[in-house]
Curated annotation (Swiss-Prot):
<dbReference type="InterPro" id="IPR036983">
    <property type="entry name" value="AIM24_sf"/>
</dbReference>
<dbReference type="GO" id="GO:0005743">
    <property type="term" value="C:mitochondrial inner membrane"/>
</dbReference>
<dbReference type="InterPro" id="IPR016031">
    <property type="entry name" value="Trp_RNA-bd_attenuator-like_dom"/>
</dbReference>
<dbReference type="InterPro" id="IPR002838">
    <property type="entry name" value="AIM24"/>
</dbReference>
<protein>
    <recommendedName>
        <fullName>Altered inheritance of mitochondria protein 24, mitochondrial</fullName>
    </recommendedName>
</protein>
<keyword id="KW-0496">Mitochondrion</keyword>
<feature type="region of interest" description="Disordered">
    <location>
        <begin position="35"/>
        <end position="54"/>
    </location>
</feature>
<feature type="transit peptide" description="Mitochondrion">
    <location>
        <begin position="1"/>
        <end position="11"/>
    </location>
</feature>
<comment type="similarity">
    <text>Belongs to the AIM24 family.</text>
</comment>
<dbReference type="GO" id="GO:0007007">
    <property type="term" value="P:inner mitochondrial membrane organization"/>
</dbReference>
<keyword id="KW-0809">Transit peptide</keyword>
<dbReference type="Pfam" id="PF01987">
    <property type="entry name" value="AIM24"/>
</dbReference>
<feature type="compositionally biased region" description="Polar residues">
    <location>
        <begin position="39"/>
        <end position="54"/>
    </location>
</feature>
């Protein structure tokens, strides 16, 4: 028997004869490592990567770094004379020459932002020398994501309080107002130009890359931001149970009941209006709680989506009117696909020429072409102007005798 094998046998036999108390003093070190997670697949069968958001972004004048575990701080490195806009009350600390730093309170479009519930009070920080600032939020269950805009792709910030900080001389942020049934644009901010953008979300933030030809459906309360493409996200509604919940109305009753004086007086009373208001509130509440999981957004690739793991309640994202509109629609897309550009309608001259060609070709033996027919019609409609000695102008048609 070889020497290493003998040592192994002796070691095993020695441990067997040890008393239980002696065995308790022995320890063994274990290493536990997280296995690499596999990429999930999309419903279309193709690979749909769900990865973490970039932890840093850099431009010519600034740099954003997300630090902390979990991500809880944003480090901003600014060059001289570069402006940093951050939400009021989020600036934690600043390193550099404090005498060169200027901090002012900026009010950004308060009337437009207040209508959609977007914060409009921001702190503007600038310095004559390079500085480094730390930015954070009060909530302990948030994480940060940074986005570098190079001017080729615009972004839409879907959540009202997701915009934390930004920098860039040509960066423009405009709030969008919901003028119609547009689920994805309620309380959103359109970001265009070039610069750096810092977003904050509840829980962890992840980035979803949707390739061309793929579709991805996500709950609107979990969407933080997404790239703006020719195919905007559309509301989607899953199939639900056949349970119907309707508010009783008078239109379904027979006409002789609707025309009765008692029914007319009752429908115009305050008691009836209060009862109908209560029924409508109950219906809206049931759609937000019982059928609320049916309201989703469908994204068509190519697109990039930032999603958060902890979304707010549905009533913080959608209004009661939007919930009722979507819940009343059949399952599937509540808004049709993007319509292609409308075909150019033929002008009146083209229609006239086409009709003339059909009329000429319909004859058994056409003796005139369309051009000759047009010239004949144009000639019969001509008038000749004659200037008399008295200075008068007389219009005469061809062939007309005085």
């Amino acid at each position: 028997m070889s020497q290493p094998l003998r040592r192994g046998v002796r070691a095993v036999s020695w441990t067997r004869v040890l008393p239980p108390r002696a065995r308790q003093g022995q320890t063994r070190c274990l290493q536990i490592r997280a296995a690499a997670a596999e990429q999930p697949s999309s419903a279309n069968g193709n690979n749909l990567p769900v990865v973490g958001t970039p932890s840093s972004a850099e431009s010519a004048d600034a740099r954003f770094d997300v630090i902390g575990a979990p991500y809880s701080l944003l480090s901003v490195s600014l060059s001289a004379s570069q402006n940093l806009f951050t939400r009021r009350g989020t600036l934690v600390g600043l390193s550099g020459k404090a005498d060169n730093v200027v901090s002012t309170l900026s009010v950004l479009e308060p009337f437009r932002r207040a209508v959609v519930g977007v914060p409009f009070l921001y702190q503007k920080v600038s310095s004559a020398s390079p500085v480094t600032a730390l930015v954070s939020v009060r909530s302990p269950t948030t994480s940060f994501a940074v986005v570098h805009l190079d001017g080729s792709v615009d972004w839409m910030v879907a959540q009202r309080r997701a915009l934390l900080a930004w920098t860039g001389r040509s960066l423009s942020i405009k709030p969008t107002i919901n003028t119609s049934l547009s689920v994805s644009h309620w309380g959103s901010s359109e970001v265009t130009g070039r610069g750096l953008l810092a977003l904050v979300g509840a829980g962890q933030l992840y980035q979803v890359e949707v390739k061309a030809g793929e579709q991805y459906i996500v709950h609107p309360s979990n969407v933080v931001a997404y790239t703006m493409t020719n195919n905007p996200p559309r509301p989607y509604r899953f199939k639900s149970t056949t349970l119907k919940f309707q508010v009783p109305g008078l239109k379904g009753w027979p006409s002789f009941i609707q025309d009765s004086k008692f029914i007319r007086d009752m429908s115009g009373s305050d008691t009836w209006k209060t009862a109908m208001n209560i029924f409508h509130k109950i219906r809206t509440w049931s759609r937000m709680t019982i059928w609320g999981d049916r309201l989703f957004l469908q994204f068509d690739g190519p697109a990039t989506i930032l999603i958060q793991t902890r979304g707010p309640r549905i009533n913080e994202v959608l209004t009661s009117h939007e919930v009722n509109e979507i819940a009343s629609a059949p399952r599937g897309l509540t808004i049709g696909p993007a319509k292609p550009a409308e075909e150019k309608k033929p002008s009146a001259d083209e229609e006239y020429r086409k009709a003339a060609e059909e009329a000429v070709n319909a004859a058994p033996a056409p003796t005139r072409t369309v051009e000759q027919l047009e010239q004949e019609i144009r000639g019969s409609a001509q008038s000749i102007a004659t200037l008399t000695k008295e200075g008068k102008v007389i219009f005469e048609k061809p062939g007309q005798q005085n």
